[in-house]
Design a protein with these regions (language model features):
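Short coil-to-helix segment of the ABC ATPase nucleotide-binding domain corresponding to the Q-loop/switch region
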Residues: 94-101
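ABC ATPase NBD coupling module
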Residues: 66-82, 111, 183-185
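Catalytic Walker B motif of ABC-type/P-loop ATPase nucleotide-binding domains
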Residues: 159-162
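Helix-to-loop junction immediately C-terminal to a conserved catalytic motif
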Residues: 49
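Conserved ABC transporter NBD signature motif
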Residues: 57-66
Length: 225
């Protein structure tokens, strides 16, 4: 579902964030993306999301060449991707329900459909009973679960998670990873950027490692280079 072909990204400052990156992630995989701070993880995620463009090479997502997607097509492309952020990026002036409903409202869903989908997503993450609360009243782990519900409410084929457990203790981190595994078992492709080596080891999933803008291991499904 994701393929990078000889992808490099050089910023205007001269910094080369990625250099000749090649890898393939198959549909339905759950893959961890790891590497030191500044290794290129965030840049790689931004290229998948069309928040950045490669300086060289080709990025394919769902069989589509992203360099051909322009203008209004970008927003449509992003509807098929759920994103989970480390800092949640929730709106604290809206209820939990309204936060999770946002992607559906943007996509033009009917009110009845929105209600059903939001409540199903909140039920999956164990927060249906808090749909009317303000996110600021929730714990950090609960806020992250709201972020996950928002990411999956539109039933995307692909979910990207950038350091989703970065601010959580080990027990809460394990709970979040259990949620991700459950969504993966339903067929969702997941790419999770994380520094948590212990957590990765327990999950027994493929690891795509970056160092200084290059893929050092895990470039192909099955863990081979």
């Amino acid at each position: 579902v994701i393929r990078f072909e000889n992808v490099s990204k050089r910023y205007d400052t001269g910094q080369e964030a990625l250099s000749r990156v090649d890898f393939h992630i198959a549909r339905g995989e759950m893959v961890f993306l790891t590497g030191h701070s500044g290794a290129g993880k965030s840049t790689l995620m931004k290229l998948i999301m069309l928040m950045e463009r490669p300086s060289h090479g080709q990025v394919l997502v769902g069989g589509r060449q992203t360099n051909r997607i322009r203008g209004a097509g970008i927003a449509h492309f992003r509807r098929d991707i759920g994103v989970v952020f480390q800092n949640h990026q929730l709106l604290f002036d809206r209820s939990v329900f309204d936060n999770v409903a946002l992607p559906l409202q943007v996509a033009g869903f009917q009110v009845g459909d929105i209600g059903r989908r939001v409540r199903a997503a909140l039920d999956k993450v164990g927060l249906l009973h808090k749909e009317r609360q303000n996110p600021i009243t929730l714990s950090g782990g609960e806020q992250q679960r709201v972020g996950i519900a928002r990411a999956v409410v539109n039933k995307p084929a692909l979910v990207l998670a950038d350091e989703p457990t970065g601010n959580l203790d080990p027990e809460l981190s394990a709970e979040i990873m259990t949620l991700f595994r459950q969504f993966n078992e339903l067929g969702t492709t997941l790419v999770i950027a994380t520094h948590d080596i212990d957590l990765i080891g327990r999950m027994n999933k493929r690891v795509l490692s970056l160092a200084n803008g290059r893929v050092t291991s895990g470039a192909a499904p099955g863990g081979s280079q």
